[in-house]
């Protein structure tokens, strides 16, 4: 268990420290009793078996990734400016959850355990996604995918998504690892449909794929392009949200898909009372590990900004989805529950998509009005937790400083009401923007978050931070870590579109994050980092608490805080220290 221990030390040194603290404000929740709405459509999915990558290579049908690929798009995604009301909404000043005193001491962050590049492409943006499984890391981008061994070495050649889905493939992939089933999942858009594949076994390199498609002439979007699809795993289905009018939530029949049953179906819903700003990307909570909740009561989450027309105060909306595969008439989605939040401003540049300055080139898209990939769910012995984030403008002046507003929700048990356990806004050091976040929780409840960062003097970089479960609520308490720094700038305002962080199922501790950077072409880099300790006993000094200012005398009482990074509780331990190369002193 992680705990702080105040320790009094007698030392001879000059120290100047200034520590500020920020209190978290609790806000009342305002749940509404939900009414339910029925499923809109049910369709049969088209099924085919597709051979493994190794089989395709052997029989000559393998379609390699095109290094010069350009996305085969329908209507370009994220091109409609957000519909905001100028001057409307709170806060009128800086983000109230930001601690702008970045000199505050943070806990030490470990260096990345592993970094490796998954692709170097010319497509814009690269759409990085990846999930770590028990035996492989599955990476995908734009219109291609590849398996890697867990040491970062390639396990297969890079393959075109067409090798799974054929010519009806339009990119925007999302990949998943279904921990309970020990299977790998690959998805992409079709021209006006969805493509979905799950590995036949836990060996996706040598065994084949169950591939499903929602036929274009049946897909319930009225011919609309299924823009910006985001997938999640829940106990009773594979869930997908899209940026479409009308039906924008789709559920695929997980139980049948896992066994390659050709009678698998898809159900679709129109999300009630979701206020949009012109673009919308809500997400169903995705199960982090193999510990699934009871079937049913999947939760859909989306932000509601009072800068948008039709929203009177900043809040989070939650919908509950229940699917009955035997009798679709019983399937339903609830009216939303509303959770009041601390005021935030998610609008950049009046809702346009050229936002964040680089050292040169176009201002890049902050990806506003979006629950970032993915909203994650984890069961613990005493509660369930959900974590998610979205980008906000933390600067209350005419300038802009992108930060990441993040949340942990909790419920007492499966199907129980959600409440806000903690909320925070993270900003990067040195005046850099922090955006394009992806976050999750490990087995101890520690939160890890990867993100992108950029400024007028520094090109895009991929970075990470996090917090221990026992830390002060609402703060990312770990120092910022660096995964990779770009050597060039983006030549387009389109950047990344999303990133992806997953948790290693072999130890339930390591966070695997993938994002876009420039080397000098658009490239995707994976960074692996860990917060939880591997040692049973591991302590370290994290702050000097008193005195915080002034000059010390020849003999002075100094109080420091020591943090238990280890897995076990400790007490009555010795503390040793050394000042300016002097003798080592031990306090007992």
Language model features with spans:
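Extracellular/luminal regions of secreted and cell-surface proteins that mediate adhesion/ECM remodeling
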Residues: 534-588
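Intrinsically disordered, low-complexity segments enriched in glycine/proline and serine/threonine
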Residues: 6, 80, 439, 559-560
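C-terminal PAP-associated
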Residues: 24-534
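Compositionally biased regions
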Residues: 19, 161-163, 485-491, 544-547, ...
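Detector for intrinsically disordered, low-structure N-terminal pre-sequences
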Residues: 6, 12-14, 38, 49, ...
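Bacterial Sec-dependent N-terminal signal peptides
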Residues: 1-28, 555
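Prokaryotic Sec-type signal peptides and long signal-anchor helices
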Residues: 8, 16-21, 66, 74, ...
């Amino acid at each position: 268990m992680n705990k702080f221990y105040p320790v009094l030390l007698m030392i001879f040194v000059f120290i100047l420290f200034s520590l500020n603290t920020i209190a978290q404000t609790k806000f009342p929740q305002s749940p509404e009793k939900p009414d339910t709405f029925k499923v809109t459509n049910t369709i049969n999915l088209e099924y085919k078996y597709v051979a493994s990558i190794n089989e395709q290579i052997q029989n000559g049908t393998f379609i390699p990734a095109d290094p010069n690929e350009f996305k085969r798009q329908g209507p370009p995604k994220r091109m409609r400016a957000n519909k905001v009301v100028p001057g409307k909404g709170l806060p009128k000043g800086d983000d109230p959850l930001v601690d702008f005193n970045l000199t505050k001491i943070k806990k030490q962050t470990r260096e990345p355990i592993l970094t490796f590049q998954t692709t170097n492409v010319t497509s814009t943006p690269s759409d990085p996604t990846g999930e770590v499984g028990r035996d492989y890391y599955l990476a995908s981008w734009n219109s291609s995918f590849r398996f890697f061994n867990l040491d970062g070495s390639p396990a297969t050649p890079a393959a075109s998504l067409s090798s799974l889905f054929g010519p009806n493939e339009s990119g925007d992939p999302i990949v998943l690892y279904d921990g309970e089933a020990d299977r790998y999942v690959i998805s992409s858009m079709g021209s006006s449909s969805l493509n979905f594949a799950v590995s036949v076994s836990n060996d996706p390199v040598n065994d084949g794929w169950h591939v499903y498609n929602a036929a274009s002439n049946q897909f319930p979007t009225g011919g609309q392009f299924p823009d910006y699809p985001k997938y999640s795993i829940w106990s009773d289905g594979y869930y997908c949200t899209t940026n479409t009018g009308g039906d924008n939530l789709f559920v695929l029949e997980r139980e049948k898909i896992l066994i390659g049953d050709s009678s698998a179906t898809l159900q679709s819903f129109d999300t009630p009372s979701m206020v949009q700003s012109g673009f919308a990307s809500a997400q169903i909570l995705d199960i982090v590990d193999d510990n699934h909740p009871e079937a049913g009561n999947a939760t859909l989450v989306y932000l509601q900004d009072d800068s948008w027309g039709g929203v009177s105060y900043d809040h989070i909306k939650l919908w509950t989805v229940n699917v009955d595969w035997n009798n679709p008439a019983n399937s339903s989605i609830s009216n939303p529950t509303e959770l009041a939040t601390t005021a935030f401003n998610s609008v950049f540049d009046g809702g346009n998509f050229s936002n964040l300055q680089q050292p040169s080139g176009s201002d890049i898209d902050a990806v506003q009005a979006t629950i970032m990939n993915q909203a994650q769910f984890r069961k613990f012995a005493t509660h369930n937790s959900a974590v998610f984030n979205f980008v906000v403008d933390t600067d209350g002046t005419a300038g802009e400083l992108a930060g990441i507003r993040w949340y942990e929700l909790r419920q007492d048990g499966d199907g129980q009401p959600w409440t806000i356990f903690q909320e925070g806004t993270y900003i990067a050091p040195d005046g850099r923007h922090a955006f394009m976040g992806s976050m999750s929780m490990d087995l101890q409840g520690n939160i890890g978050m990867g993100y992108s960062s950029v400024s007028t003097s520094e090109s895009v970089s991929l970075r990470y931070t996090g917090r221990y479960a026992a830390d002060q609520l609402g703060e990312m308490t770990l120092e910022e870590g660096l995964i990779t720094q770009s050597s060039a700038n983006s030549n387009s305002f389109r950047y990344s579109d999303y990133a992806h962080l997953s948790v290693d199922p072999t130890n339930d501790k390591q966070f695997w994050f993938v994002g876009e950077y420039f080397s000098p072409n658009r490239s995707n880099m994976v960074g692996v980092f860990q917060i939880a300790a591997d040692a049973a006993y591991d302590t370290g000094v994290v702050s000097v608490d008193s005195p915080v200012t002034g000059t010390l005398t020849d003999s002075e009482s100094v109080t420091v805080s020591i943090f238990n990074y280890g897995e076990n509780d400790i007490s009555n331990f010795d503390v040793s220290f050394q000042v300016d190369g002097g003798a080592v002193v031990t306090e007992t």
